Amino acid sequence: KEGYAMDHEGCKFSCFIRPAGFCDGYCKTHLKASSGYCAWPACYCYGVPDHIKVWDYATNKC
């Protein structure tokens, strides 16, 4: 699956002030995803395993 990475509060994980390539590494390391990029202003991940939670508009609390 694909989607936005979340922080510990369930909000989209910001990449606003992160260096280039940060989101790819973050998605691979923390979400076990195949890749990711900064979809300004938040990290978007591809190939996320089904058991890993990604940000969902329906359950957004931010």
From Swiss-Prot:
Localization, UniProt: Secreted
Disulfide bonds: 11-62, 15-38, 23-43, 27-45
Tissues showing expression: Expressed by the venom gland.
Pfam family, one: Toxin_3
InterPro entries: LCN-type_CS_alpha_beta_dom, Scorpion_toxin-like, Scorpion_toxin-like_sf, Scorpion_toxinL, Scorpion_toxinL/defensin
Swiss-Prot/TrEMBL keywords: Amidation, Disulfide bond, Ion channel impairing toxin, Neurotoxin, Secreted, Toxin, Voltage-gated sodium channel impairing toxin
Domain called LCN-type CS-alpha/beta: residue spans: 1-62
CDD domains: neurotoxins_LC_scorpion
Main location per the UniProt record: secreted
Modified residues (Cysteine amide): 62
The protein's role, per its UniProt record: Alpha toxins bind voltage-independently at site-3 of sodium channels (Nav) and inhibit the inactivation of the activated channels, thereby blocking neuronal transmission. Is toxic to mice.
Domain comment, as recorded: Has the structural arrangement of an alpha-helix connected to antiparallel beta-sheets by disulfide bonds (CS-alpha/beta).
Protein name as it appears in the record: Toxin Tst2
